[in-house]
Regions:
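PP2C/PPM-type serine/threonine phosphatase catalytic domain
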Residues: 1-301, 305-321, 328-332
Length: 336
């Protein structure tokens, strides 16, 4: 059985208190080696304490530490989503309890409250967890695509306040999304002290200028935000995906659930970059086609599930497992 390639990720990060005496931002990353990277992936976490509280820096540090430590202690049988959400939910409850036991129990704006944004990359999938107004971006060409929603409530006079954060209530809603990643993809996590004073194009330009030194790029972004007049703490993290690992069985099933079943194919039809030559086999379970790669003429065989089984989720999961198993077979008697 061939040894699967491990996920390779680089992380650059920097934080500065700026004009404030205390840095209420907190950030961290965990890039484990070997089996743990394969089973749990790489985690990058950012939290921002609220300015009205003198203990929100404690909350931010606790939130980051909890996710970076406790996530890796959850069962390998759990999905990334279940593992991280359980940890964040427990942290939220703990922070809320700390406020209830403190002198600030009647004024939550002075309690153990912070925002949180986390990026966990496992295999070939990025998982995003988010509460508050810190942000996660994906670098898209010369600009940034914002992947998270700011949980802020805007008032008629133009002011706004934080609408959701960790520690405010005993339970909180945690935004989650996942997306496929590939080698060359890059993500940026930032606190509002940065993204409210740095246009997306300037962030991308700083990364390009200092490449491949991501720490230098992060320092440059923070410094520019402060020079642009940011009055807040400034923190940025840059995540570069250098190599993705093959998806495990649970990831492939998760990805499968987001795809539509292909229709019945016919000769000369284009499908996923190939041209169908003819049908080789058909049954109530699946269809098998001979196809060629335009430009090279290379022949391939494509197998698709029958549309008659599109509601049979268990069958579709088993269908996906065929590819997962085939990748792990290394035999001269098996066609690859």
């Amino acid at each position: 059985m061939p040894t699967p390639a491990l996920l390779q990720v680089r992380v650059g990060q920097h934080s500065d208190a700026g004009r404030k005496s205390v840095n209420q931002d907190f950030h961290g990353a965990c890039l484990p080696d070997g089996p743990q990277r394969q089973s749990k992936g790489v985690a990058v976490v950012l939290a921002d304490g609220i300015g009205s509280s003198d203990v929100s820096d404690v909350a931010a540090a606790a939130a980051v530490h909890a996710l970076l430590v406790d996530y890796y202690c959850t069962s390998d049988a759990w999905s990334v989503k279940r593992s991280a959400q359980c940890v964040v939910a427990a942290t939220n409850s703990w922070l809320h309890a700390q406020t209830r036991r403190s002198p600030y129990r009647f004024d939550q704006d002075r309690g153990y409250v912070c925002t949180l944004s986390a990026l966990i990359v496992k295999g070939a999938t990025a998982h995003l967890f988010h509460v508050g107004d810190t942000r996660i971006y994906r670098v898209q060409g010369r600009t940034l695509e914002q992947l998270t929603e700011d949980h802020r409530v805007c008032m008629t006079d133009g002011r706004s306040y934080l609408g959701r954060a960790l520690g405010v209530q005993p339970q909180t809603e945690i935004d989650y999304r996942s997306l496929p990643v590939d080698a060359g993809d890059m993500f940026v996590l930032s606190t509002d002290g940065v993204h409210e004073h740095m246009p997306p194009g300037a962030i991308v330009q700083a990364i390009a200028t200092h490449a491949p030194d991501l720490d230098a790029a992060a320092r440059s972004i923070v410094q520019q935000a402060l020079e642009n007049g940011s009055p807040d703490n400034c923190t940025v993290q840059i995540v570069a995906i250098d190599r993705v690992a093959p998806a495990d069985a649970s990831e492939m099933q998760h990805q499968r659930a987001q795809l539509r079943l292909p229709p019945v194919l016919s000769a000369r039809q284009q499908f996923e970059g190939y041209e169908i030559v003819r049908e080789l086999y058909t049954s109530h379970r699946s269809h098998v086609y001979l196809a060629t790669e335009p430009g090279t003429g290379r022949q391939v065989v494509i197998k698709t599930p029958s549309i008659d089984r599109q509601e049979d989720q268990a069958f579709l999961d088993r269908f996906v497992l065929e590819e997962w198993i085939a990748r792990r077979i290394d035999s001269p008697h098996v066609l690859r």
